[in-house]
Amino acid sequence: DREALVDFLKALKARSGCEIYLEPGEAVALDAGILVGEILDVFDNGMPVGITDISATCHMPDVIEAPYRPAMLHERSDGPAIRLGGPSCLAGDIIGDYVLPDEPHIGQRIAFLDQAHYSMVKTNTFNGVPLPSIWLWNSENDMLRCVKSFDWTAFRDRLS
């Protein structure tokens, strides 16, 4: 009941004198946005490990803060898994274990689904890891347009 909520919030504001803001929540961006990255290195540590340019701690904080495993575009249901991690020095910068569509290799693109709700508002530049660029995809003509990209000055300016 929207009108009852509006009336309640107006009464609360009048009683408390506080400004009240409603955060829209993830519903406005649920199932929207993908986070695309690249495998930078592959090695064996008892299982295949891939270091990516995507950081769980910097770009996907729910992976660390909550029991959350983001879905990956074109992930296979079976086969040998690779543990994907980020480039920061944080020991827990682990995205998770995934079965990639191809043999893992340096330069391989990966894409995580449903990332708009946090990859834009909770990102950080811990350890100098850059913020992800924001691109728009036009599904009618398959064109990509860069809306915003970030460089070292974005890191510097967040500190001052």
Q: Where are the predicted features?
A:
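Acidic, glycine-rich loop-and-beta core segments that form the ion-binding/anion-interacting portion
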Residues: 1-24
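Charged (often Lys/Glu-rich) extended helix/loop segments that serve as interaction or gating elements
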Residues: 17-160
